[in-house]
Amino acid sequence: MRTVLHYVAKGMDGVERILRLLIGIAMVIMVVIIFYQVILRYVLNSSNIWSEELARYLMCYVVLLGAAVAVRKYSHLQVDFALNMLPVRARCIAVVICTLAGIVFLVYFCQYGIDLCLNTANSTSSGTGIPMSYAYACLPIGGVLMILASVEVILKELTKFIELGNGKKEVQA
């Protein structure tokens, strides 16, 4: 189990590095676009449509790609009062069950995102002219990445559960 986890973690490390780079680039582009829009609107008393729309689409990608990183790092907001009261092995099982429930939700989330992309394949956005399916593609992309991160979380917790059952006192998953 530890070997499988090692290879999955190495692969996800690479995915996370790419995601962090893409998120950083998207954030810089968003700041530049919004700054441009503010200058255009309040200094030059002019406006355009594309900048606000593009910033909104970039924000959706940033949020969903960032959510995948957050799942992997256990960084999502959670109420863990009851979870922390459990013994370590029971906590592992509870995390696995909750993560499996999250995966079920994410499968539906991805399916909805794919349906939305397919239904909007022939329409374009009014401001930028890009296909709406590109804007909505963040849903299945983010969902799949969150599922992959969730699988890694499950493997970490199961590895910890097994190793604690084999008599180890402290386990780093």
Regions found by a protein language model. Give the residues of each.
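Alpha-helical transmembrane segments and membrane-interface helix-loop junctions
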Residues: 1-173
